[in-house]
Amino acid sequence: MLDPQITTVLFDLDGTLLPMEVEHFTKTYFGLLAQKAAPYGFAPEPLVAAVWKGTKAMVKNDGTMTNDRRFWEVFCQATGGEESLLRPVFDGFYQQEFHGAKAACGENPLAKQAVEGLKAKGYDVVLATNPIFPRVGVETRLSWVGLTLEDFSLVTSYENFTTCKLNPAYYAEILRNTGKQPQECLMVGNDAVEDTAALEQGIPVYLITDCLLNPQGRDLSGLPHGSFREFLAFAGLE
């Protein structure tokens, strides 16, 4: 049962609302991106290496610039490309070809039920997905579980955030953007490292175990956790 103080539920996307096995999804995603970028002179391996380099730079971002600025700065340095030419190509990819990566993900009809059910009960619902993708890439992935950007009061993407998971400052940034206190929020995610970083800001956490990521073998006995369906019961939606 949700604590009476909670007014806002923060949902992770990948592995939480959208079931996936990360390695399979990433391989599919990079394969599609390499096909898109090939006509622009990018060989697959250097392209993937440059994207990873830009992604790692975003993960280390310290709040001094938006994540997209950090990504494009590093990516263009690594490739010698120009953002003004490449950014529209990437955005077009996330609108179109990226839909092919849906095949690497699972179905979750309960995602829409959870978001709509919580909103019907008066909760604010935030999409607290790691902001390493552009907004259009988030929108595309949401569509695979029947949701839209407009279903959330805040969506974290690389355009509007300056930190990433697993930095606790990411959760502080959410609190600033929503005007909420930590005890008013609940973080719902599947990563026992990245999502539990919310605890360092005083935000309670519920871990979804269907696609659980627990690389450090953390003892979950002290945390509320369960399948997505069990979360619905926990939230009073079933």
Briefly describe each language-model feature range.
Residues 1-50:
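Active-site neighborhood of HAD-like aspartate-dependent phosphohydrolases
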Residues 1-9, 116-117, 130-133, 138-238:
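Asp-based, Mg2+/Mn2+-dependent phosphohydrolase catalytic module
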Residues 22-25, 29, 107, 137-138, ...:
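Residues at alpha-helix caps and immediate loop-helix transition turns in enzyme cores, especially N-
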Residues 26-34, 51-56, 72, 90-98, ...:
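Hydrophobic alpha-helical core bundles mediating ligand binding, dimerization, or RNAP-core interactions
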Residues 45-95:
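A metal-dependent, Asp-based hydrolase signature
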Residues 65-70, 84-88, 95-126:
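Short, acidic loop-to-helix structural element flanking the phosphoryl-transfer center
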